[in-house]
Amino acid sequence: MKTREEALALDRDDPLAPLREQFALPAGVIYLDGNSLGAQPRAAAARAQQVIGAEWGEGLIRSWNTAGWFALPRRLGDRLAPLIGAADGEVAITDTISINLFKLLAAMLRHQARHAPKRRVIVSERSNFPTDLYIAQGLIAQLDRDYELRLIDDPADLPDALDDETAVAMITHVNYRTGYMHDMPSVTQTVRQAGALMLWDLAHSAGAVPVDLNGALADGAVGCTYKYLNGGPGSPAFVWVPKRHQRAFEQPLSGWWGHRAPFAMQPAFEPDPGIARFLCGTQPIVSMSMVECGLDVFAQTDMHAIRRKSLALTDAFVALVESRCAGQPLKLVTPRAHHQRGSQASFEHPHGYEVMQALIARGVIGDYREPRILRFGFTPLYTRFVDVWDAVETLRDILDTEAWRAPEFATRAAVT
C-alpha cells in the first residue's frame, strides 16, 4: 500500500467493511485505541434504554426472571466461548480481570497444595500487565505458607524457570505494551509437562486473534470485554475454566451467586458444580447487557477473517511508518513475525507522550505506555485501510514540523 488511492481500493474489497456501519464512530476521528477501549456498537444505546427503561423501569425485580437477568453471566459466556476455543458451560461473564485472576490463581494454588504441596511458585513475566503481578503479590501476602512469585525477563527463559516447585504459570497471551504474542499451545505444553497449571490472561487476545484454549489444554483463563469485544467502559470481564477442572477448583470468593442453589438461603456454602461457582455477588446487569451488542457483531464473521485483516492492517501501518517517517527516532517494538504479533503496532519515541497527545489533538487516537511507547490498536471490525494511511500522514507531519513540542502536549493527564 503506497498511496491513499490503494488504501481506498483495499477498503472497497474488504469483506468486513460493512460491519463498520454497526459502530458509532465520530466524524473526523481515526480511532486506533480499540486495544484499550472498543468503539460503541450502535445497538448499545437502544439496548441500554431497553434495560433501564423497560426491564428495570417497568419490569422491576421481575426482570431477574422475565428478562433473563439471572442467567445472563452464563448465557453471554456461552456466546463468547467460540471466540476463545471454549465449550458451552465453561465461560462466565463476571467481575473484573483482577478479581477473576485472584479467584483462579487462588483456586489453582489451593488445588496444587492438596495434590503437590511442594509446588509454591508462581511464574510470570516482569513485563506482564501490572495488575496481574499485583494480584499475585497480594494473594501471596494473604497466604500462611511460603509462596514465591518468580519473574522472567524473556519468553525464552520460561522453560528454565519451571521446576518441581512451580505451581502455576501466569502469562498474558499478547503483551499489552509491545503486542508480542506467545505460542499458546507450545507454552501450555511446556508448563503442563513441568507439572504446573497454565493460567492465561486474554485481555489483548479475545476478539483480536484466534484463541483455542481447549485445543491447547490450558487450565484456566481470564479476559476483558471492553477492548476488542466492544462491551463498553468498565464492562465485566470473563473467566474460563474447562469442565475437567470445574469441580476441583475452589475459588475463595464464595459469594451467594456461586452457590449451587442461591435462593435456598442455606447457611453453609455449597459451590455450584459448574462455571457458576466462579460467580460471587449480584451481577452488574446494565453494563453486562451491553456486552451482547459487541458479541452480536462478532457473530456475523469469524476470527480467521478478523485475523487476516488485522495482519494486513498492522503490516501496512508498520511499512508506512518506516517509509513515510524515515529518519525519525521511531523504533518498532512490536514483532514483525505474524505468529508473534497481536493486533497492535507499538513504536518507541524519545518524546512518545508528547507525540501521542499531538496525534490525539488532530483526531488520531492511540495511546501511550511507559516507557516512551506509542501504541496503536487495530480493530478489523471498524478500522479501515484509509485510516492507516491518514494516521501515518498525520504522524509524519507532526514529526516533521515538531508540532509535538507545543507546551500543552507535555502536560500529563491522569489516563494516558
Curated annotation (Swiss-Prot):
Binding site for pyridoxal 5'-phosphate: 97-98, 129-132, 172, 201, 204, 226, 256, 282
Requisite cofactors: pyridoxal 5'-phosphate
Keyword presence, Hydrolase: yes
InterPro entries referenced in this protein's UniProt entry, alphabetically: Kynureninase, PyrdxlP-dep_Trfase, PyrdxlP-dep_Trfase_major, PyrdxlP-dep_Trfase_small
GO MF annotation, one: kynureninase activity
Pathway the protein acts in: Amino-acid degradation; L-kynurenine degradation; L-alanine and anthranilate from L-kynurenine: step 1/1; Cofactor biosynthesis; NAD(+) biosynthesis; quinolinate from L-kynurenine: step 2/3
EC numbers, comma separated: 3.7.1.3
Reactions it catalyzes: L-kynurenine + H2O = anthranilate + L-alanine + H(+); 3-hydroxy-L-kynurenine + H2O = 3-hydroxyanthranilate + L-alanine + H(+)
Keyword Hydrolase: yes
A single GO cellular-component term on record: cytoplasm
Keywords assigned by UniProt, alphabetized: Hydrolase, Pyridine nucleotide biosynthesis, Pyridoxal phosphate
Disulfide bonds: none
Job description of the protein: Catalyzes the cleavage of L-kynurenine (L-Kyn) and L-3-hydroxykynurenine (L-3OHKyn) into anthranilic acid (AA) and 3-hydroxyanthranilic acid (3-OHAA), respectively.
Family of this protein: Belongs to the kynureninase family.
NCBIfam families: kynureninase
Matches recorded under HAMAP family: Kynureninase
Protein name as it appears in the record: Kynureninase
Gene: kynU
